């Protein structure tokens, strides 16, 4: 379009205003004009003019397009400072191109306007403008300020027409964008305010634990949400969902929240065109998490409740009887179910389950322990019965062992232990002490069990402890130089020893000196203080005095004609010397000392004599070396075995000189030897016990054979008797089954 045509068209609005018309839509009625004949010259001139105008327009458009490209190049290549400096220096690219400079100023103005509006838009997004007026005032001031600042920054006159045209361009679109953004912000703020108000209102109600626990709390919440959606207090379904989620989250952290959530979960709400329950709206996983939090909060928000809960569980766990603990935990569980009625796992329920598992384990262990204790108790009673029977057999003369290792074992007793023997001994001694019989009878009964006991048995240990205590009482008196007023162990030992001194001496040979002391006080009437003083002198003897005593002792032995002294076993020499010295220093009488020593040796040894007419002594052997079992009197069986062995060896070796064998003890062995040393047979306690056991088995076998023979002798008589009885029984049965009238008499 040419400038002339543009000017003509642009003049019409002005013309309308001059005429006072309203302008309207610019409608004009169509006019027709008769064709005027035109000459070919005029037509040619017109076409020429039009062609020139079109050429000018095309050239101008090309110039403006090139100017647009050049202005873009300048903006791209140069910073604002460089452009300003280039303008001032006259070195700006394409500064001779007026179209390029015009386009540059227009674009600079447009960019400046967009920068200002971008700043305003950012402020809108940040929520700076709470009202429309605030936004408009700020934008107006920024536009005025920005137009000047940006123009000066690029070296352009702020009042430049092209710059102003670019700065003011697209104002409508920019306004729409800014006002729309601010309207959206205000709408969001209004919605947030509504949600905030609703949340504040709900919190005012739901923060009260008593309100949350009320049965109608769920109904209130349901109605509040429904009314809010209807009245617009809750602007949208999305915000309703947000409000509901937030309300449930808040309630779950408060006391009573678990009760509220339990009731409201199945209430219905319509959102986004669908009706669901609140549980379905939140989602099962999230709902369970809320319930766990709510039930945990019951305790976390109530310190006293939490403290009581912990103390109750600890109290239950610390009960000695797991049955009591289990009952307490069941009560705690019932209380917890009231506070946390749902099935979700909470820390409190975990504590309870853990406590229940511990108590169950304790219960299992306790049950097993009780069962074992009951079994042990029954077995203990059975053991005591078995032990008592063994002791009674032994006391009655049967050769049975009373060692716990040799007790008969069955499923009702289990394996025997030394503690079982101790329990039996304590029980039996207590029974004897509680009997209403004289003390002498009690001591006699105790000695029977003592004699029947095994070597290291409980009875011997108990009496041995008493003997040891008595020895310590005397030793303490020797050190102190005076016998105390009370000597309970010595008194008890004196009483029980007087009942059978030989048995006590045989069982505790290392206490021979103590037994001698008691005999000197009780039987010889020597003052205890005299004996104490003598013992103190004996302890304080010098080396020379000991040497003289040794010589005197050897002389006394050599002068004695007693076989027990002449053939004194080496194992008894030290004990014999103690007795000799004790009597000598206490009484000052060497003859009495020899007499007591001889008495001790006769009680502690057995003298073997030959088979000749003279009956010469062939050996002196300690009695305890000949014991075949734990019974002190079993040395007699060992003696008989040695006698049989001696006679058998002599009979099988007739060349032995004088048909005699010498017997002597050395260490733990007993030897039988002829005068030449060619025959030398060794025995010890183990071998004697073995021979005795074999002899017992042979005797038992003979007894069984004899009993069987007696039974076989009686068998025919017994069989005949049984046959007669069976025949008579058959006759009686037959008569019962047969009618009596067939025999000619009807009754």
UniProtKB/Swiss-Prot annotation:
Localization per record: Virion; Host periplasm
GO biological process assignments: symbiont genome ejection through host cell envelope, short tail mechanism
Protein name: Internal virion protein gp15
Function: Component of the cylindrical core that assembles on the inner surface of the capsid during capsid formation and plays a role in viral DNA ejection into the host cell. The inner core is composed of stacked rings of gp14, gp15 and gp16 proteins. Following binding to the host cell surface, the internal core is disassembled and gp15 is ejected along with gp14 and gp16 into the infected cell. Gp15 probably remains associated with gp16.
Keyword Metal-binding: no
Protein family (similarity comment): Belongs to the T7virus internal virion protein gp15 family.
Main location as per UniProt: virion
Superkingdom of origin organism: Viruses
Alphabetical UniProt keywords: Host periplasm, Viral genome ejection through host cell envelope, Viral penetration into host cytoplasm, Viral short tail ejection system, Virion, Virus entry into host cell
InterPro entries: Gp15 (IPR038993)
Organism of origin: Escherichia phage T7
GO cellular component, one term: virion component
Assembly notes: Homooctamer. Interacts with gp16; after ejection the gp15-gp16 complex composed of a gp15 octamer and a gp16 tetramer probably binds both the viral DNA and the host inner membrane. Interacts with gp14.
Keyword NADP in record: no
